Regions:
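Thiamine diphosphate
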Residues: 1-164, 168-172
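Aromatic-enriched
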Residues: 170-180
Length: 180
């Protein structure tokens, strides 16, 4: 078994090998979200060649920045945080949907099975909220194969895409993947 957030980290790094303009990061949770591109450095004032961004604890700004990057063009932006914090991102996600921007939102720890963080980190209504935003694709993969398929769809569709990922290990099912 493997948590889909771990599968997501593997998939993101494989995508980065083939798509050098994949650019993004996490609010302050890159190790937990598994969003660090291992063969790239952090983008900074002194290093403009990095593809990893440390946005800091400001989910709305992170999401709005990714919208701006998508509007500028040339890069494939993604950003990540715990799913419960998607509430802070909602106005910017809604704007990306209105503009049809190809931003990928990686939202981990997607259930009440999040462990020691307690009830403040247990998303209940967030998945329904994301699914209700017109023009936004929302994926909740059941395993690693569906996680890879969700990223492929997000990159192919060219619209805002939220990918909800588990913290807990999930079995790999025989009949999942692209067709699911």
């Amino acid at each position: 078994s493997m948590a889909t957030r771990k599968a997501s980290g593997v998939v993101l790094n494989r995508i980065a090998e083939k798509l050098p303009n994949l650019f993004g990061g996490s609010a302050d949770l890159a190790p937990s979200n598994n969003t660090l591109l291992k063969k790239s450095e952090y983008f900074s004032k002194t290093n403009r060649s990095g593809n990893n961004v440390h946005f800091g604890i400001r989910e709305f700004a992170m999401t709005a920045i990714c919208n701006g990057i998508a509007l500028h063009g040339g890069l494939h932006p993604y950003c990540a945080t715990f799913m419960v914090f998607s509430d802070y991102m909602k106005p910017a996600i809604r704007m990306s949907a209105l503009m049809g921007l190809p931003v990928i939102y990686v939202l981990t720890d997607d259930s009440i099975g999040v462990g020691e963080d307690g009830c403040t980190h247990e998303p209940i209504e967030q998945l329904a909220m994301l699914r209700s935003i017109p023009g936004t694709y929302t994926f909740r993969p059941a395993d690693g194969k569906e996680t890879a398929a969700a990223y492929e769809a997000a990159l192919t569709l060219g619209k805002p895409s939220a990918i909800a990922l588990s913290r807990q290990g999930l079995p790999c099912y025989e009949n999942t993947g692209k067709a699911a």
